[in-house]
């Protein structure tokens, strides 16, 4: 039995481990990696730098938007507080005005009722005076009528002339 311990380390062709540094791809790999590192470092560095700048710009824009939103929020809150204060003033003014209108309306109603009562009293007084005058007039007419009926029988010629003279004197004094 012939055992070959190094069948994988063939000198010609195939797969094997070559320990000669000049013959190996190690130098080629180092050169390729060095060239890639040299050229890609600038390209990747620029790409990463652009990405970093874009991220910083986006972050700066976001911070600016946050500041603008905060300013707008503060302004809106101030406007809201002012609007609420104005609404409270309008409500208070409205309540005051409504109360004033109610009081004025009540006062005018009371005044109108008092005026109606005074008018009714005045009308009643005027009606009483008119009725009283009418009753006096009717009473006077009835008295005159009765006197006219009874007077000719009760008056003689001297009493009649005396009555006429006295009536003339009364008319002259009046």
UniProtKB/Swiss-Prot annotation:
Query: What GO cellular-component annotations does this UniProt entry give?
Result: organellar chromatophore thylakoid membrane; plastid; proton-transporting ATP synthase complex
Q: Which UniProt keywords apply?
A: ATP synthesis, CF(0), Hydrogen ion transport, Ion transport, Membrane, Organellar chromatophore, Plastid, Thylakoid, Transmembrane, Transmembrane helix, Transport
**Any single GO BP term:** proton motive force-driven ATP synthesis
Provide an example Pfam family for this protein.
ATP-synt_B
User: What residue ranges carry the coiled-coil annotation?
Assistant: none
Q: Where in the cell is it found?
A: Plastid, Organellar chromatophore thylakoid membrane
Name the domain of life this protein comes from.
Answer: Eukaryota
Main subcellular location of this protein, as a coarse class? plastid
Q: Which GO terms describe its molecular function?
A: proton transmembrane transporter activity
Extent of the signal sequence? none
User: Which residue ranges traverse the bilayer?
Assistant: 26-46
| Annotated membrane topology | Single-pass membrane protein
Q: How does it assemble?
A: F-type ATPases have 2 components, F(1) - the catalytic core - and F(0) - the membrane proton channel. F(1) has five subunits: alpha(3), beta(3), gamma(1), delta(1), epsilon(1). F(0) has four main subunits: a(1), b(1), b'(1) and c(10-14). The alpha and beta chains form an alternating ring which encloses part of the gamma chain. F(1) is attached to F(0) by a central stalk formed by the gamma and epsilon chains, while a peripheral stalk is formed by the delta, b and b' chains.
* Biological role stated in the UniProt entry: F(1)F(0) ATP synthase produces ATP from ADP in the presence of a proton or sodium gradient. F-type ATPases consist of two structural domains, F(1) containing the extramembraneous catalytic core and F(0) containing the membrane proton channel, linked together by a central stalk and a peripheral stalk. During catalysis, ATP synthesis in the catalytic domain of F(1) is coupled via a rotary mechanism of the central stalk subunits to proton translocation.
Q: Which family does it belong to?
A: Belongs to the ATPase B chain family.
Entry protein name: ATP synthase subunit b, organellar chromatophore
Origin species: Paulinella chromatophora
Gene name of the encoded protein: atpF
């Amino acid at each position: 039995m012939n055992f070959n311990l190094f069948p994988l380390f063939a000198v010609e062709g195939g797969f094997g481990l070559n320990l000669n540094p000049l013959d190996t791809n190690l130098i080629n790999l180092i050169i390729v990696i060095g060239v890639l590192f040299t050229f890609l470092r600038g390209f990747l560095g620029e790409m990463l730098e652009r990405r970093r700048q874009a991220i910083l710009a986006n972050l700066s824009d976001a911070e600016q938007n946050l500041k603008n939103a905060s300013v707008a929020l503060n302004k809106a809150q101030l406007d809201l507080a002012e609007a609420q204060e104005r609404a409270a003033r309008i409500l208070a003014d409205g309540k005051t005005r409504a109360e004033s209108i109610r009081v004025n309306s009540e006062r005018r109603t009371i005044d109108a009722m008092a005026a109606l009562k005074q008018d009714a009293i005045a009308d009643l007084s005027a009606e009483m005076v008119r009725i009283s005058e009418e009753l006096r007039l009717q009473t006077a007419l009835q008295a005159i009528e009765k006197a006219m009926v009874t007077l000719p029988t009760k008056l003689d010629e001297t009493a009649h002339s005396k009555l006429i003279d006295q009536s003339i004197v009364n008319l002259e004094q009046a």
